[in-house]
Amino acid sequence: GGGGGDRRSDMRLDIPRVIAGEDTRTTLMVRHIPNKYTQRMLLSVIEQNHSGQFDLLYLPIDFKNRCNVGYAFVNMISFHHVPAFYREFHRRKWERFNSDKVCEINYGRIQGKRALIAHFSNSSLANEDESMQPVVFASDGSGTRERWHSPGGGRRGF
């Protein structure tokens, strides 16, 4: 019961609690991304130091103007990888497109690779071209790409 407190503070990262293993959430929302960034650009920025540490990246695109909507979701394989990711990206300025935007890292409302895939597969993504779909990796840290497929199967034409 109760008012549930401030929803936004629930989404803030408290790194000492993460390090202590008291907050084991793994899905992060990367906010204030310049609109010209593509998912491939974002992937290469993240993979520089965090390759094999995450198993899903999704930068939603506004289908009308073909630009990103300003935020992305990253699911870390383990909460142990969260502090380093946070330290690198939180309050960091973006290097390309000399943007004034400053990155902010929060927790995502939907947590976990499977929950994210289930959530996104309810949208029209299954029928979009690959650059518009989430990038999914094996959860074993190998960095192996997995096919994005909606669990519902989507259209199974021949």
What role is predicted for each listed range?
Residues 1-29, 34-67, 77-158:
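Long, polar low-complexity intrinsically disordered regions
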Residues 72:
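Extended catalytic cores and adjacent scaffolds of nucleotide/polyanion-binding enzymes
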